[in-house]
Amino acid sequence: MFPLSSHHRLLAGSRLCLRVALTALACCGVLHAGSMRFESAGTYVSNDTYYLDAFARVDLGMEPIQALVNGVELHFLVRLAVYKTRRWWIDTPILERRLRYRLDYYELTQHYRVTDAQTGKSANFRSVAAALRELGSLSRYALLPAHEINKRRQYVASIQLELDVTRLPGPLMAQAIRSSEWQLETEEFRWSLN
């Protein structure tokens, strides 16, 4: 067996320290089950386009964070919709969209990466808290052209965020589907578009 280099010993030591810290926090009750909730969402018109700004507070909890630092990619799904409200019938959707994001941890450089699956753009963060703030933020997202909205009708927009457990590796997915720690999603957040 080959001796470990100082770099490999440092990485192994930092991984062990992280696991010990997570276990200690869990035993003390400091770490709790994760949660997600939208704190704000709204639309505005600029240059004949409706834009969306939204912010969700995302707290993963212990099991998803442990999986993340052990190399498991976490996938998130944002559901957007705009409905034309109807007084005596079901609201009619005029826009339904799904946005996908991925969160990775890179042990060698000890950073977290958030990737937008639609554009391929990514951003790196030194802490999981900073990466989760980015995941929960949607800023100046072009929703739909203003001419598609009839000013004499009422419209409602909605947004929802969830941790997509169907994208986890097989054995972990089977466990996650049964575990409440992995069932993370926001309530549907609705607001009047006009």
Give each language-model segment a name.
Residues 64-129:
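Structured domain cores in non-transmembrane regions
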Residues 1-13:
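N-terminal secretory signal peptides that target proteins for export/translocation
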Residues 53-56, 107, 130-145:
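A beta-strand/beta-hairpin structural motif
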Residues 34-74:
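N-terminal onset of structured domains
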Residues 36-42, 62, 98-100, 140-145:
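Short structured motifs
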Residues 14-29:
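Bacterial N-terminal signal peptides
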Residues 45-50, 106-109, 147-156:
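A short, structured loop/turn motif at beta-sheet edges
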Residues 143-194:
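Glycine-rich, aromatic-bearing surface loops/beta-hairpins
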